[in-house]
Amino acid sequence: MNTQDVINIFKQADAILEGHFILTSGRHSATFLQKAKVFMHADLTEKLCRGLAQEIKRHVEGKIDYVVGPAIGGLIPSYETSRHLGVPSIWVERENGVFRLRRFEVEKGARVVIVEDIVTTGLSIRETIEALVAVEADVVASACIIDRSGGKVDVGVPLIALAEYEIVSYTRDTLPHELSKIPAVKPGSRDI
């Protein structure tokens, strides 16, 4: 599966939105990838996550003990990807604003791969790494369906992307004039 295949799946689900969006990262963009519109279709989700699992197998040497997803956005892709890898899926969730592994225990040194939906700045992956390092897990890699940075983001471990699809994003201070005229919508899940 290549980048165009992934984009075609998003188009098939009407999941590429145009307007003025405040991303989960806090950055602004004229394009939003509404992965919920893809994930509501099990067949499309299965295709993407099967492809992501194949990429993980190609890039990660050795055993994987767990796939870990950051709640909320990483829950569905991490679960479906773990199914294709044949390993358990667990997740981190926010407690007082900080990701924690609350419902699960992992063995010291357990080899884990973090699976996220869409990466822009990599903050959720970095916060997930912190939570896993705190319980002495070995984060061997991270993976995502789409890397919006076009391969530029550094999350601290290898990032395996099913697709790199660079979409320009802006800080509030650097918004183009035409985008600043459009009312902003915040469809992400960071503050939930």
Curated annotation (Swiss-Prot):
What's the catalysed reaction? orotidine 5'-phosphate + diphosphate = orotate + 5-phospho-alpha-D-ribose 1-diphosphate
Pathway where this protein functions: Pyrimidine metabolism; UMP biosynthesis via de novo pathway; UMP from orotate: step 1/2
Cofactor(s) in the UniProt record = Mg(2+)
**What GO MF annotations does this protein's record show?**
magnesium ion binding; orotate phosphoribosyltransferase activity
Any one of the GO BP annotations: 'de novo' UMP biosynthetic process
Domain of life per record:
Bacteria
Q: Which residues bind 5-phospho-alpha-D-ribose 1-diphosphate?
A: E116, D117, I118, V119, T120, T121, G122, L123, S124
Q: Which residues cross the membrane?
A: none
- Annotated coiled-coil segments of the chain: none
UniProt KW keywords: Glycosyltransferase, Magnesium, Pyrimidine biosynthesis, Transferase
Residues where orotate binds: T120, R148
Q: Which SUPFAM superfamilies match?
A: PRTase-like (SSF53271)
Matches recorded under NCBIfam families: pyrE_Therm
Q: Which family does it belong to?
A: Belongs to the purine/pyrimidine phosphoribosyltransferase family. PyrE subfamily.
Tell me the subunit arrangement: Homodimer.
Its annotated function is as follows: Catalyzes the transfer of a ribosyl phosphate group from 5-phosphoribose 1-diphosphate to orotate, leading to the formation of orotidine monophosphate (OMP).
- Under what name is this protein listed? Orotate phosphoribosyltransferase
Q: What is the lineage of its organism?
A: Bacteria, Pseudomonadati, Pseudomonadota, Alphaproteobacteria, Hyphomicrobiales
